[in-house]
Regions:
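A glycine/threonine-rich phosphate-anchoring loop and its flanking beta-alpha core
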Residues: 1-53
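Solvent-exposed alpha-helices and their adjacent loops that cap or buttress functional pockets
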Residues: 2-6, 82-83, 171-173
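C-terminal charged capping/lid subdomain of soluble metabolic enzymes
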Residues: 31, 131-199
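Active-site segments that bind and position negatively charged phosphate/pyrophosphate groups
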Residues: 46-160
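Short beta-strand segments
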Residues: 5, 12-13, 92, 180-182
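A generic hydrophobic-helix recognition signal that picks specific residues
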Residues: 7, 87-88, 177
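Residue-level signal for inorganic ion chemistry
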Residues: 14, 119, 185
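Structural motif
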Residues: 9-11, 114, 178
């Protein structure tokens, strides 16, 4: 297996292809877009609050806007941390819980659906820890719901299996779970030099 750390010279986006996707897939993709707004672009988050239905209807202007913003957010993070030494960990917002749910559900949930549930779980935990206000936690949850994404762990998920799966996450250190947290809307919590995960 060979991996390269070369960045693309150009990114091409075919918005017309989005129109061929079923609504569940569009919603699933929107989870990552909402995540990008939460972790690095308040303007994107606020745009989605006003226009999420247009995106689901594949409005050309709305889709072009979020496609461009998605690329910009990810580019900023990846170019500052090409080799995944710290900052890039912020792209895992919602993924600690989300990946575990996705696996334990035996992939009955799309990736974005599982990430949406994980984002709500991490926002609620972040609220308890004082990183995000109740108002902003509710904004995240409501936007995910408007994007037609689940926000609660389905009843069929075995809770014991889920907890066990959480401990296989790549961010676990010395047997301790670590989460990344958003700071209100549009920023990430930093817990020291190049430290974005918290036990």
């Amino acid at each position: 297996l060979i991996g390269l750390f070369n960045q693309p010279k150009k990114v091409y986006l075919d918005i017309d292809t989005w129109k061929t996707l079923p609504e569940e897939q569009l919603s699933s993709g929107l989870a990552e877009t909402i995540k990008h707004g939460c972790l690095g672009d308040k303007e994107l988050f606020e745009y989605l609050e006003k226009n999420v239905e247009k995106v689901l209807e594949c409005d050309g202007e709305a889709c072009e806007y979020i496609a461009k913003k998605n690329c910009e957010v990810k580019y900023k993070v990846v170019m500052k941390d090409e080799r995944e030494s710290g900052l890039r960990e912020v792209l895992n917002l919602g993924h600690t819980v989300g990946r575990a749910i996705e696996t334990v559900s035996d992939y009955r949930l799309y990736h974005g659906e599982a990430v949406a549930i994980g984002m709500v779980a991490q926002a609620r935990l972040g609220e308890k820890l004082g990183f995000i206000s109740h108002e902003n936690e509710q904004r995240v949850e409501k936007l995910l719901e408007r994007a037609k994404l689940p926000t609660k762990i389905p009843d069929y998920i075995d809770r014991k299996a889920l907890v066990k799966k959480l401990y296989t996450d790549k961010k676990v250190r010395d047997g301790k779970l670590r989460f990344v947290f958003q700071k209100e809307i549009g920023e990430m919590m930093c817990f020291g030099e190049n430290q974005y995960g918290k036990e």
